[in-house]
């Protein structure tokens, strides 16, 4: 049998199957929108910035994965490889965020490349090239030759938090990844936070966090990045508030390990009046942090400056740890877990709130979401030798910390990008 003919028929069947999936799933998605009286998605400036309704998410996942696969399968091999080279993002997003172009372009109006060049001091030709690269990615539009107007994406970038997040990536983050292979060659152990692509790219000593802390500007950029992620679809706090039986704890003490400025603890205290919260983080100004807590919650939300890798001095019912493990290599994550053994007793637990990578690409997540998670994973190793982990890797990690640690359960609320991993200690 001619293998080329067989493969051709299989590919033909696949592209037809993908087209059918797209047609069926778009119809399902549109039916949800119609039932709720919602407009169809568009790139228009006045399009809704809200995520699609929860009921439409499965159809959305199917459409996005199928359209991406159909696009890729129709490319020749060389084009498929080369389309992954996206260095131009660093250039045009760096320009847009540094010079606050989204807030220079008026809502409902337009501005000329000439005016943008005058505002920024750039030569008009380079302004056109940068912004037209962005326009090809649906960021801004050119409704008339020589003029720039908003799309829903560029309008969203008027947000100070999002724009600052992009500025962080452009100024500090994205080109760090270019040194990842060099760093892995130089430090093959991939464990220490001061032996990373970040160190090579910026020619600095010390860890990423230590370097961020040296500059008030960089510290604020980092804080904005954190705030941005909490608003991304799949990372919202309601997944935590609704996804765990906090009420079932009764009157309980919860320690928010590595809780930064206490946003999560404040949200928990607002929803669950029986919880007493203590936020622990390194080099924290306890008084300043507590001053920002709403007055009605001040007696239940407290702060403690503490090196989270040293022995835990406070007993609690739950030690909640959100997206801290992914900042660290296994060497330090096992140390973090061991720091809690002296305080864990029957009924208490460590509640890890973090990503779970599929064991094999495409096996348990829509691929469009997994791509983002894999990108995050590489960003973590580039900056701090952190990592995302699969279920098997989580089990291995807790056992390596101490064989008496066991994962009691893993749950992932529908629509959440983070799983709740409940770890107990069988003393």
Curated annotation (Swiss-Prot):
Q: Active site: which residues?
A: 326 (proton acceptor)
Name the domain of life: Eukaryota
* Temperature note: Optimum temperature is 35 degrees Celsius.
Per the record, the pathway is: Mycotoxin biosynthesis
Task: Identify the Gene3D superfamilies for this entry.
Answer: Vaccinia Virus protein VP39, Winged helix-like DNA-binding domain superfamily/Winged helix DNA-binding domain
Identify the keywords attached in UniProt to this record, alphabetized: Methyltransferase, S-adenosyl-L-methionine, Transferase
Q: What is this protein called?
A: O-methyltransferase PaMT
Q: State the species of origin.
A: Phomopsis amygdali
């Amino acid at each position: 049998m001619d293998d080329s003919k067989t493969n051709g028929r299989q590919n033909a069947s696949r592209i037809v199957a993908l087209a059918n999936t797209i047609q069926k799933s778009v119809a399902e998605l549109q039916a949800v929108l119609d039932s709720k009286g919602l407009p169809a998605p568009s790139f228009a400036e006045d399009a809704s910035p809200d995520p699609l309704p929860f009921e439409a998410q499965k159809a959305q996942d199917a459409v996005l994965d199928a359209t991406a696969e159909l696009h890729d399968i129709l490319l020749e091999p060389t084009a498929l490889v080369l389309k992954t080279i996206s260095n131009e993002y660093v250039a045009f997003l760096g320009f847009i965020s540094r010079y606050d172009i989204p807030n220079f372009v008026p809502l409902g109006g337009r501005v000329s490349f000439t005016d943008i060049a005058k505002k920024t001091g750039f030569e008009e030709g380079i302004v056109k090239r940068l912004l037209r690269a962005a326009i090809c990615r649906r960021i801004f539009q050119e409704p008339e030759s020589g003029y720039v107007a908003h799309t829903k994406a560029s309008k969203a970038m008027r947000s100070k938090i999002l724009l600052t997040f992009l500025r962080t990536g452009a100024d500090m983050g994205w080109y760090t990844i270019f040194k990842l292979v060099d760093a892995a060659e130089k430090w093959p152990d991939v464990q220490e936070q001061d032996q990373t692509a970040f160190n090579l790219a910026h020619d600095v000593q010390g860890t990423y966090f230590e370097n961020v802390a040296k500059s008030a500007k960089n510290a604020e950029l980092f804080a904005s990045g954190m705030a941005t992620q909490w608003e991304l679809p799949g990372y919202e706090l309601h997944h935590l508030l609704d996804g765990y039986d906090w009420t079932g704890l009764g009157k309980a003490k919860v320690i928010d390990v590595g809780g930064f400025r206490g946003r999560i603890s404040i949200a928990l205290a607002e929803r669950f009046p029986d919880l007493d919260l203590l936020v622990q983080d390194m080099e924290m100004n306890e008084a300043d942090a507590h001053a920002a807590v709403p007055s009605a919650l001040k007696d239940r939300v407290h702060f403690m400056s503490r090196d989270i890798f040293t022995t835990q001095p406070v007993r609690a019912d739950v030690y909640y740890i959100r997206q801290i493990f992914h900042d660290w290599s296994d060497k330090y994550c096992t140390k973090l877990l061991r720091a809690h053994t002296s305080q864990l007793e029957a009924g208490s637990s460590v509640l890890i709130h973090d990503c779970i990578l599929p064991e094999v690409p495409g096996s348990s997540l829509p691929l469009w979401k997994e791509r983002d998670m894999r990108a995050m994973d590489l960003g973590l190793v580039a900056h701090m030798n952190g990592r995302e982990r699969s279920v098997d890797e989580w089990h291995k990690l807790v056992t390596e910390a101490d064989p008496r640690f066991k994962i009691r359960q893993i749950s992932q609320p529908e629509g959440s990008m983070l799983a709740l991993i409940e770890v107990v200690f069988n003393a």
